[in-house]
């Protein structure tokens, strides 16, 4: 998979941003590092990539949080917690070339109710995957989007987070992890002959 462009609207501290991974210094890079001061948005960028690809983030992965409590009317593990305070809508769109060589666009979005007693409350989020090649399909059902992500990226959510996007503190967890799980991840990355 090759990430081409990331567009962020009203996610956490980022009001609006477009990151072009094909232009400038990033255009030829096979690997890149996201760095900056504490609070500068590094983790938010990673959250946005996984949100577009998988409809969830490592930070708010519901399967990791037991007995989640509500915060501000949303479950603690609800990705809508990332919506910028006071925003009426939020979205993340990721353009990429999948492992199958096809161009895709993955979008996660949410809007707020515009009137009535629930005005300002966030609606259920939408998640869409689109094959941007000629005659390509668009998927809007969660299961179909999960299958499109698996096809294009080559990893399911947890594998992706453990390999391509080791969030804060997770590198040590990978190094100390189960040998079979590490072998499976490495096999997918570089092939059985090299593992």
Language-model regions, residue ranges each:
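Short, small/polar-rich loop/turn modules that mediate ligand/substrate recognition or access, typified
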Residues: 167
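Cytochrome P450
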Residues: 174-179
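Catalytic phosphate/metal-binding cores of nucleic-acid and nucleotide-processing enzymes, i.e., regions
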Residues: 185
């Amino acid at each position: 998979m090759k990430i081409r462009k990331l567009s962020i609207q009203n996610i956490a501290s980022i009001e609006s941003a477009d990151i072009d991974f094909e232009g400038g210094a990033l255009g030829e890079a096979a690997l890149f590092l996201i760095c900056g001061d504490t609070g500068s948005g590094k983790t938010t960028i990673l959250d946005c990539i996984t949100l577009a690809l998988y409809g969830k983030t490592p930070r708010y992965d519901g399967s990791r949080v037991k007995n989640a409590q509500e915060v501000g009317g949303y479950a603690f593990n609800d990705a809508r917690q990332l919506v910028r305070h006071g925003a009426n809508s939020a979205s993340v769109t990721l353009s990429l070339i999948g492992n199958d060589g096809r161009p895709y666009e993955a979008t996660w979005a949410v809007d707020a109710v515009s009137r009535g007693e629930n005005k300002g409350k966030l609606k259920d989020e939408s998640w869409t995957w689109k094959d941007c090649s000629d005659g390509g399909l668009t998927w809007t059902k969660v299961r179909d989007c999960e299958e499109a992500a698996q096809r294009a990226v080559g990893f399911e959510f947890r594998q992706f987070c453990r390999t391509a996007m080791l969030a804060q503190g997770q590198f040590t967890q990978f190094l100390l992890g189960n040998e079979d799980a590490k072998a499976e991840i490495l096999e997918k990355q570089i092939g059985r002959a090299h593992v």
